Amino acid sequence: MLTFEDCLALCELTEDEIDAIAEHEQVSETVALELGSCLIHGPDGQLLIQHMIIDDIQAARRRGDLAHAAHLKQTLRRFIEEHCARAGKPD
């Protein structure tokens, strides 16, 4: 039986990115992991995930949770560096 950690190791996303998807979609981490894995391989998936994280940042700011907003901003920065910066580059 695969654990969450096993599935995370097979996914191209970090746990923070999965957590942001789960927060945005209001689903469990396991569902978010599956969704994120599908999105990251789709044509507009990187952009969709980016927008989810941005939405989460804005929601955290609106409710005054600046520490969480800062954490999500770091998550967004790492996501862009890892996925968007290498988009179109051969592996």
Residue ranges and their predicted role:
Residues M1-M52, H71-D91:
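Long, non-catalytic architectural segments outside compact domain cores
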